[in-house]
Amino acid sequence: MTTSELPARTSPTPDVRNGIDYKVADLTLAEFGRKEIRLAEHEMPGLMALRREYADVQPLKGARISGSLHMTVQTAVLIETLTALGAQVRWASCNIFSTQDHAAAAVVVGPHGTVEEPKGVSVFAWKGETLEEYWWAAEQMLTWPGEPANMILDDGGDATMLVLRGAQFEKAGVVPPEDADHSAEYKVFLNLLRERFETDRGKWTAIAESVRGVTEETTTGVLRLYQFAAAGELVFPAINVNDSVTKSKFDNKYGTRHSLIDGINRGTDVLIGGKKVLICGYGDVGKGCAESLAGQGARVQVTEIDPINALQALMDGYDVVTVEQAIGEADIVITATGNKDIITLDHMKAMKDQAILGNIGHFDNEIDMAALERSGATRLTIKPQVDLWTFGESGKSIIVLSEGRLLNLGNATGHPSFVMSNSFSNQVIAQIELWTKPEEYDNEVYRLPKHLDEKVARIHVEALGGTLTKLTKDQAEYIGVDVEGPYKPEHYRY
């Protein structure tokens, strides 16, 4: 189908109350959301410590932050930390299924507002968006009244891509045509840019020139940043938050260890113990997946392309196999690679009857959902984000969670607050770095320095009741570090 054949797109209309524009599922859910936010604040010591440290300084004053990150209760605490430090914020979710509607409502109303007179932040997010609605919300999040956004906080790179590709196409004077190989989502993306090219040409260039920097939350988005940088297309500095140790080794592993089985249990309520499980990928996320499922008594196998990760899996006690070797016997299959086409249509047809298939990587192309939808298989929705797909030729069925998108956020509520406190503390620090020290950053991808990573960890060690050993001056000199840290070189692998 070409663009000219696509049905006319009807965009949502923002609601406006008390001067705040927004689009959420139900603003009356705000009270429930506020109760959960208060509970989460207790479990997010890093963010609360940053509020206490910087509240008087207001280091983000003047920052207009456009945020694209799962609109959860934990994200609400992040948003209100950014505003407590002086920033103005507009927000959208980075996934069509991950929004917690009560959290979105609470952020719009704000801690001191009411449903009738909200005093919070502009949010454009609700659970169960269509692709058209998702990209509409992304544009709203980037569209400020008056001056354009000057900071981006991203998860997965969609906000960054929208700005960079939009500016690139404006410079070229044309939005490229659709290609047969483009996904349905990329066609929606191009259609949005094509519409804006006709109605507001120059919009994305103005935003790109205004943005002082972007901070990126996740592996997939970081990969995009490095690709933009390598191609000479990154026109503002970026901080790779994902590779901060207190993010990647905690959010990616320990957070996944908690939220994967939560998503499987809420989605299917099947017994995990004794089942054969195939985990595709053994990075930090895959390690958390394998550990959680093995802890439930599952028999875990792992696929890997990297011999180092494969050796780790073997020494952790897991068989390392190929998808083709294991797919026919697995009761549960989870993708965690950050790559595409990990589970193909042929793989799905080879799966056991009523085997469970889910993804915990950022995008929905690890599982070839487009091929499944074209295959003629029939889809029966059991409940939201749980679908039974039946192949006519064999009569076999598979259970697909969250349409191949993040099952821990689609079928459950994502990582717990304490883990996200680590990640989001890094986000706040990174935003402060780029906003207050623009002269120190070129249009490249950076990581936060080690002493800031250790600062985040120290706060959370104390919150859990841990007591750190103190080096003597002689001991510090002996190993070549300062008494107060950093304690490891940048190349150290935790």
UniProtKB/Swiss-Prot annotation:
It is found in: Cytoplasm. Its cofactor is NAD(+). It comes from the Bacteria. Keywords: Cytoplasm, Hydrolase, NAD, One-carbon metabolism. The keyword Hydrolase applies. Binds 1 NAD(+) per subunit. One of its GO terms (biological process) is L-homocysteine biosynthetic process. InterPro entries: Adenosylhomocyst_ase-like_sf (IPR042172), Adenosylhomocysteinase-like (IPR000043), Ado_hCys_hydrolase_NAD-bd (IPR015878), NAD(P)-bd_dom_sf (IPR036291), S-Ado-L-homoCys_hydrolase_CS (IPR020082). This is Adenosylhomocysteinase.
